[in-house]
UniProtKB/Swiss-Prot annotation:
A motif (SH3-binding) lies at residues 635-643. PANTHER family: BREAST CANCER ANTI-ESTROGEN RESISTANCE PROTEIN 1, CAS SCAFFOLDING PROTEIN. Expressed in B-cells (at protein level). Widely expressed with an abundant expression in the testis. Low level of expression seen in the liver, thymus, and peripheral blood leukocytes. This is Breast cancer anti-estrogen resistance protein 1. PTK2/FAK1 activation mediates phosphorylation at the YDYVHL motif; phosphorylation is most likely catalyzed by SRC family members. SRC-family kinases are recruited to the phosphorylated sites and can phosphorylate other tyrosine residues. Tyrosine phosphorylation is triggered by integrin-mediated adhesion of cells to the extracellular matrix. Dephosphorylated by PTPN14 at Tyr-128. GO terms for molecular function: protein kinase binding; SH3 domain binding.
Length: 870
């Protein structure tokens, strides 16, 4: 009969392959409840971290000195020969008593069974009380796996029932560097209490929250909403969706249209492109768009205008039909990758006036669609059947022979239309060769004289789509990497899981391609920045672009190392870990680059013209007088934006990383003149206006400017010209005097007006934190919060000095001091959050302080109202 409740140590890592099996790591200590449980030879029933399950016995080692009887089954290792006796030591026990309780004898430690405690002196020796009745702990394990010798503590204990850890005073002798734990008598069962540090090593441990929780404004206060599960889809703006009761794909029909009509259609949904001259197996067509768009049509009809950059189809021969076509579209959009529905949200927009009639559009996808959202493991790989962008449309013969291609609207900023010989023209989106890719990349960095930037709205949408693509592909790669590490398919080359390996390699390529697409967009924007009125914009954007290029090169290097290691004989688990660690930071880098482009979009791209384009517009990208859609891109260049702070120099705080945090401190309670002077200086600093505005989203600019005006408005302190809204009623006997009542009512109105400004500033601050804006953004908003609250402190200071009633002075002074303390806390936490960005804990602490400030200001207003009504 096997003994129960034996403590064992894990010799290797173990990954559970069934719900009944336990996962553990090397070095974990667990309780063996039963050996060879339920007739399963070699499987033991164990308990670890409060969970029970079966584990392979050959991955455990029974610890020393547990029981005084020999187990029924064989031990986990071969029996070792007894050690030779030494002078002054007890002889080892015979094999018949392998499990024996520890006796007060001397224990000779072995090299691998000694716990060293780095205690510098004897003064630091201490005793630690074990909570509750002590279990039978094991002594340090020996190299032998089945022979357990008697052990004797070197230091005597006053009582065998006392559960104390004896901490050795320091290195002195071989027997002093051991944890000696006396046995406990009378225990019916053993309980192993896992230290908290060991709990953190468990794979089931909880992870710290990676997202800052921002309270929601309810009335005049802020409360936290219930936690909502994270959404796995991208929200498409409502104004971009075509009207319809079902909100599904609006795909124009293809049957019954003449070729001339079909060529003028404008799609915002990538249709199914050409299958190729010989067709394809229908089982290989995995699309997320109804496939009947391209069925039954000759290839010549697929030359509509897209809002998504087309790419060269892998099924179409790379012949002269496509060599003469020139687009100003970055070539990275054509790189073939496995299609990920979550990465490419379909954005629909209303068709222009020259699109086909309304009766030719239906809201319901055609029946009998192909496979939708097929899991990656079930997809059949092919050279040209999996796409992340639509295929290239085939040109009609008259266009391929040298005709002018109809102009289109592309969601990528084209730097210029260049006059180049036919052999030097770049393909629309071909990046299959390194020479072609480098040629297109270099051409994007130099803008020619005929530069015509992209429209502002289209560029912003394309930038958001590219950023979302990077985030989605990285998330997909991390999921696959977790699956590969959990199943062990990547570390066990003897039994590889080919579908998972192929999906992992495809996900790595998808991440690299998504980052490359964003880089191509940014390179085009760099070319546009060279022609803007802001001369420093080109240098700033180039620095941001260089950081992203370094990230891309690192990803490519890790991906190549991963592929090379997989093909060779060496283990590649380390390569996979390095790639995953590098990929985790990619979404944040992409977000910073996209945020910078968003903030300067008004300078880099053309503003949308309000009126319909007419023939008197400027030059077009495709100078064809008969082309009806050529006037779409005839837009004048935008005028440079006007900044509200005209006195601040352009280069202020540009060369100093800490400049934007200078002067950001709250000192003592100031007087009125000093406060207004400091407030004016802070508002004129470029650290608030220019450095903050340069990275704000477009929809936040108006809110930022409105807050500037509200915060800069001084406090009205002229009581002579003030008239109360209602006549002052006589107070109760013993109440406030008329002068104090008038003073309270006057400053109560000032307090309510400034509370509105403070509430708006807090809302804008929470929005910046919730959208994970960089420090320069939320620090600028926190200054608005501090300046608005500082006005309330000034009101309280004025009342405490001018009021005659002692009760009024004491209460107002109390809340003024409270607001001062809260402002100091906000300054400290904001600095910490900026220096530790993007730490969620530091940002959450900052949010809590601002939320507490909002509640305290509301209490201050209520106290003023109660005092005025007394």
């Amino acid at each position: 009969m096997n003994h129960l409740n034996v403590l064992a140590k894990a010799l290797y890592d173990n990954v559970a392959e069934s719900p009944d099996e336990l996962s553990f790591r090397k070095g974990d200590i667990m309780t063996v409840l039963e050996q060879d449980t339920q007739g399963l030879d070699g499987w033991w029933l164990c308990s670890l971290h409060g969970r029970q399950g079966i584990v392979p016995g050959n991955r455990l080692k029974i610890l020393v000195g547990m029981y005084d009887k020999k187990p029924a089954g064989p031990g986990p290792g071969p029996p070792a020969t007894p050690a030779q006796p030494q002078p002054g030591l007890h002889a080892p026990a015979p094999p018949a008593s392998q499990y024996t309780p520890m006796l007060p004898n001397t224990y000779q430690p072995q090299p691998d069974s000694v716990y060293l405690v780095p205690t510098p002196s004897k003064a630091q020796q201490g005793l630690y009380q074990v909570p509750g009745p002590s279990p039978q702990f094991q002594s340090p394990p020996a190299k032998q796996t089945s022979t357990f010798s008697k052990q004797t503590p070197h230091h005597p204990f006053p009582s065998p029932a006392t559960d104390l850890y004896q901490v050795p005073p320091g290195p002195g002798g071989p027997a002093q560097d051991i944890y000696q734990v006396p046995p406990s008598a009378g225990m019916g069962h053993d309980i192993y209490q896992v230290p908290p540090s060991m709990d953190t090593r468990s794979w089931e441990g909880t992870k710290p929250p990676a997202k800052v929780v921002v309270p929601t404004r309810v009335g005049q206060g802020y409360v936290y909403e219930a936690a909502q599960p994270e959404q796995d889809e991208y929200d498409i703006p409502r104004h971009l969706l075509a009207p319809g009761p079902q909100d599904i794909y609006d795909v124009p029909p293809v049957r019954g249209l003449l070729p001339s009509q079909y060529g003028q259609e404008v799609y915002d949904t990538p249709p199914m492109a050409v299958k190729g001259p010989n067709g394809r197996d229908p089982l290989l067509e995995v699309y997320d768009v109804p496939p009947s768009v391209e069925k039954g049509l000759p290839p010549s009809n697929h030359h509509a205008v897209y809002d998504v950059p087309p790419s060269v189809s892998k099924d179409v021969p790379d012949g002269p039909l496509l060599r003469e076509e020139t687009y100003d579209v970055p070539p990275a959009f054509a790189k073939a990758k496995p299609f990920d529905p979550a990465r490419t949200p379909l954005v629909l927009a209303a068709p222009p006036p020259d699109s086909p009639p309304a009766e030719d559009v239906y809201d319901v996808p055609p029946p009998a669609p192909d496979l939708y959202d097929v899991p990656p493991g079930l997809r059949r790989p092919g050279p040209g059947t999996l796409y992340d962008v639509p295929r290239e449309r085939v040109l009609p013969p008259e266009v391929a022979d040298g005709g002018v291609v109809d102009s289109g609207v592309y969601a990528v900023p084209p730097p210029a239309e260049r006059e180049a010989p036919a052999e030097g023209k770049r393909l629309s989106a071909s990046s299959t060769g390194s020479t072609r890719s480098s040629q297109s990349a270099s051409s994007l960095e130099v803008a020619g004289p005929g530069r015509e930037p992209l429209e502002l709205e289209v560029a912003v949408e394309a930038l958001a789509r590219l950023q979302q693509g990077v985030s989605a592909t990285v998330a997909h790669l991390l999921d696959l990497a977790g699956s590969a590490g959990a199943t062990g398919s990547w570390r066990s080359p003897s039994e590889p899981q080919e579908p998972l390996v192929q999906d992992l390699q495809a996900a790595v390529a998808a991440v690299q391609s998504a980052v490359h697409e964003l880089l191509e967009f940014a390179r085009s924007a760099v070319g546009n920045a060279a022609h803007t009125s802001d001369r420093a914009l080109h240098a700033k954007l180039s620095r941001q672009l260089q950081k992203m290029e370094d990230v891309h090169q690192t990803l490519v290097a890790h991906g190549q190392a991963l592929d090379a290691g997989r093909g060779g004989s060496g283990a590649t688990l380390e390569d996979l870990d390095r790639l995953v660690a590098c990929s985790r930071a990619v979404p944040e880098d992409a977000k910073q680059l996209a945020s910078f482009l968003h903030g300067n979009a008004s300078l880099l791209f053309r503003r949308t013209k309000a009126t319909a384009p007419g023939p008197e517009g400027g030059g077009t990208l495709h100078p064809n007088p008969t082309d009806k859609t050529s006037s779409i891109q005839s837009r004048p260049l935008p005028s440079p934006p006007k900044f509200t702070s005209q006195d601040s120099p352009d280069g202020q705080y540009e060369n100093s990383e800490g400049g934007w945090m200078e002067d950001y401190d709250y000192v003592h309670l100031q007087g009125k003149e000093e406060f207004e002077k400091t407030q004016k200086e802070l508002l004129e600093k470029g650290s608030i206006t220019r450095q903050g505005k340069s990275q704000l989203e477009l929809q936040q600019l108006k809110q930022f400017e409105r807050l500037e005006q509200e915060v800069s408005r001084p406090i009205d302190h002229d009581l002579a010209n003030w008239t109360p809204a209602q006549p002052l009623a006589p107070g109760r006997t013993g109440g406030l005097g008329p002068s104090d009542r008038q003073l309270l009512l006057f400053y109560l109105e000032q307090c309510e007006a400034n509370l509105t400004t403070l509430t708006n500033a807090v809302d804008a601050f929470f929005t910046a934190v919730a959208t994970n804006q960089p420090p320069k953004i939320f620090v600028a908003h926190s200054k608005f919060v501090i300046l608005s609250a500082h006005k309330l402190v000034f009101i309280g200071d004025t009342l405490s000095r001018q009021a005659k009633a002692a009760d009024v002075r004491s209460q107002v002074t109390h809340y003024s001091n409270l607001l001062c303390d809260l402002l100091r806390g906000i300054v400290a936490t904001t600095k910490a959050a900026a220096l530790q960005y993007p730490s969620p804990s530091a940002a959450q602490d900052m949010v809590e302080r601002v939320k507490e400030l909002g509640h305290s200001t509301q209490q201050f207003r209520r106290v003023l109202g109660q005092l005025a009504a007394a």
